[in-house]
Amino acid sequence: MYVIVEINGQQFKAEEGKKLFVHHIQNAENGATVEFEKVLLVDNNGTVTVGAPTVEGAKVVCEVVSPLVKGDKVLVFHKKRRKGYRKLNGHRQQFTELTIKQVIA
């Protein structure tokens, strides 16, 4: 059984026991449980239920493993040819690591 759930504007395929890295969730504490009720699709052993826009009564219960995980560094380089203009910027995206404890559908 798996579901498609929307978390912070992104859609994820969720199954029990899987780990997810989602965009940083504010005020998330280590070991806290978080529920997401925007379930868009439920596949229960081949029986597919598609929500319009969400499936009623379905939710995903997750546990916060790590509230702040930094992703890989992304480098952004700007250059104007023949002018000597070069600029290098970089950032690391912040994520929250979740473990899916229960899928209720």
Curated annotation (Swiss-Prot):
<dbReference type="GO" id="GO:0019843">
    <property type="term" value="F:rRNA binding"/>
</dbReference>
<dbReference type="GO" id="GO:0006412">
    <property type="term" value="P:translation"/>
</dbReference>
<keyword id="KW-0689">Ribosomal protein</keyword>
<keyword id="KW-0694">RNA-binding</keyword>
<dbReference type="Pfam" id="PF00829">
    <property type="entry name" value="Ribosomal_L21p"/>
</dbReference>
<protein>
    <recommendedName>
        <fullName>Large ribosomal subunit protein bL21</fullName>
    </recommendedName>
</protein>
<dbReference type="InterPro" id="IPR036164">
    <property type="entry name" value="bL21-like_sf"/>
</dbReference>
<dbReference type="GO" id="GO:0003735">
    <property type="term" value="F:structural constituent of ribosome"/>
</dbReference>
<dbReference type="InterPro" id="IPR028909">
    <property type="entry name" value="bL21-like"/>
</dbReference>
<dbReference type="GO" id="GO:0005840">
    <property type="term" value="C:ribosome"/>
</dbReference>
<keyword id="KW-0687">Ribonucleoprotein</keyword>
<comment type="function">
    <text>This protein binds to 23S rRNA in the presence of protein L20.</text>
</comment>
<comment type="subunit">
    <text>Part of the 50S ribosomal subunit. Contacts protein L20.</text>
</comment>
<keyword id="KW-0699">rRNA-binding</keyword>
<comment type="similarity">
    <text>Belongs to the bacterial ribosomal protein bL21 family.</text>
</comment>
<dbReference type="InterPro" id="IPR001787">
    <property type="entry name" value="Ribosomal_bL21"/>
</dbReference>
<dbReference type="GO" id="GO:0005737">
    <property type="term" value="C:cytoplasm"/>
</dbReference>
<dbReference type="GO" id="GO:1990904">
    <property type="term" value="C:ribonucleoprotein complex"/>
</dbReference>
